[in-house]
Amino acid sequence: MRSEAERQRSFRAWPHTCRTVSPAELARSGFYYLGPGDRVQCFSCGGVLRSWEPGDRPDTEHRKFFPSCPFLQVRRGPPGGTDSVDGQILGQLSGEEPDRTWEPVCPQMAGEGDRLGSFSTWPRYANGDPQQLAGAGFFYTGHRDHVKCFHCDGGLRNWEQGDDPWTEHAKWFPMCDFLLQVKGEAFIRSVQESFFSSPETSPESVGSYEGSPVSSPGSPPVCPFLSTSVAQGALQMGFKRNRVSSLMINRFILTGSCYGSVSELVTDLIQAEEIHGTESVSVPRAPTQRERPEPPKEPAPPLSTEEQLRQLKEERMCKVCMDNDVSMVFVPCGHLVVCTECAPNLRHCPICRAAIRGSVRAFMS
């Protein structure tokens, strides 16, 4: 996808209802069509943007949310043709392979018979006909009702009665080349337009799931970075939670990495105090005569290894599907609460309810 012409070709499945921004301008700014809806991704930094509004300029939005993108930093020369990007620099700075491959991800499942054979252990309670699923390019992963496309590696689950595999394939993975070859552009475009123009799937309604971990009214949103040992170390020194949370989120969004040590975080906290005031550190005052010191509390018993592992697994679990690990950071709120499969379904952050303007893939160590 380094070629602007190749990125423009990716927009052949771009829904006609998405008229707020030009596909040509998106391709010129480094984006190719990802889907579903109006989701696009930068070929260089991997940044994803969606929910385009009238007046949005792709190049401006790209620089706003992904200022460290190698494509933006090293791009030179007039737009059009092949973008002049240093391949060596791009290889060092980009987290993903930018060139799109049209080869199947799982070639061993390229045959429909092989895919159908994978459904030998398909649960009886599961919805979805194995014959139809296999015909639409899916094979069974062996877990619950999870299936994957052999070509694009797109995964689907939680099948309901009446779901059509081809329609779901086109809805969530419109750039799959196998889907494009079999069903054609017209089918994909019709699915995209019918689904993402309906009121039930508008940006205002998608993502309002019951049971989502939404903060109660008046309470501050929970920052996932505060559970790290680095953040806990700073909090124990007396720094304010909101200041620690803000710095850690900004650091991750701007650099893609977290603070490596408490001292590094404390240095930035002190610098922030010098700019915004020194009220971040709370100094305990001596008790007055009328105050009686509280008796020391007994230390809590140490957690067992099993309990620590359980808590760690719970912290890293996707808060929507409760199955995969969290891996997507929402922009601009910075919350890290969902996996790559659930992120495309959300239009608002399930934690703070802020509108999701983009997302960045996070790789947990």
Swiss-Prot record:
One Gene Ontology molecular-function label: transferase activity
Catalytic activity entry: S-ubiquitinyl-[E2 ubiquitin-conjugating enzyme]-L-cysteine + [acceptor protein]-L-lysine = [E2 ubiquitin-conjugating enzyme]-L-cysteine + N(6)-ubiquitinyl-[acceptor protein]-L-lysine
Residues with the Phosphoserine modification: 198, 202, 212, 216, 219
Basic and acidic residues bias: start-end ranges: 288-297
Ranges for the BIR repeats: 7-73, 115-180
Annotated spans, Self-inhibits the anti-apoptotic function: 186-234
Gene Ontology CC: cytoplasm
Main location (coarse class): cytoplasm
Keyword Repressor found: no
Catalytic activity, EC: 2.3.2.27
Binding-site residues for Zn(2+), renumbered to this chain: 149, 152, 169, 176
Pfam families the record matches: BIR, UBA_BIRC2-3, zf-C3HC4_3
Stored SUPFAM superfamilies: Inhibitor of apoptosis (IAP) repeat
Residues annotated as signal peptide: none
Similarity field: Belongs to the IAP family.
Record's comment describing the protein's domains: The BIR2 domain is required for caspase-inhibition.
Protein name: Baculoviral IAP repeat-containing protein 7
Species name: Xenopus tropicalis
